[in-house]
């Protein structure tokens, strides 16, 4: 089986990286692909929480401390996604050896079409390992300057590790009238924005229920955006009923212009 390992990363936290990892995994599974989602941020259990698997034992912690076989720590979710979760245990984290991760991933990667690794945010030793494992890097950013600056640094680190940029997910678009535009972001990162994911309250509601947004509201704007992303990555055409709606907040200047047009 030909497989692809995709590390999903962001230069800073809070941009929706884990949401993107879970949603892309579910979307690829809906397209008939066999997908393994790995909770690569071993100090947290965010991906495991979204799949409601943070209490599973053994977990990646036990695998990285050589207390369990990796195949015993992989669980099939109801969406069809296979998940290698991390636990909430601080002791488990302390016992884990991140240097074992490449061998762990390579042991099972050829059982799947796609391996999605939800990497920790920022630039650190763990991130270096995740970049070295990956065939491709998928960056998640929000349309804000600090998010973009951190993403540029992360992309440069990936290039040094020999990991090419697959593209950029521009997340939470339409939240603020002061946000940067797509063209400006592509110019700064020197990478293509594959999809714009609109600000969507369904994402937060889904997370509270420990679900991906695609499970929660399959026709929501964010769900459609993630299905589009999976379609681009897998090369499988899909039909989206409506154009993805991105409602941008009206700036003060736009409001003044609109008022003048009324007279």
UniProtKB/Swiss-Prot annotation:
InterPro entries: AAA_dom (IPR025669), MinD_archaea (IPR010224), MinD_FleN (IPR025501), P-loop_NTPase (IPR027417), ParA/MinD_ATPase (IPR050625). Keywords: ATP-binding, Nucleotide-binding. SUPFAM superfamilies: P-loop containing nucleoside triphosphate hydrolases. Gene3D superfamilies: P-loop containing nucleotide triphosphate hydrolases. One of its GO terms (molecular function) is ATP binding. This is Uncharacterized ATP-binding protein MJ0169. Coiled coil: none annotated. The keyword Hydrolase does not apply. Pfam families: AAA_31. The keyword DNA damage does not apply. Belongs to the ParA family. MinD subfamily. Transmembrane segments: none annotated. It comes from Methanocaldococcus jannaschii (strain ATCC 43067 / DSM 2661 / JAL-1 / JCM 10045 / NBRC 100440) (Methanococcus jannaschii). ATP binds at residues 12-19. GO terms for cellular component: cytoplasmic side of plasma membrane; cytosol.
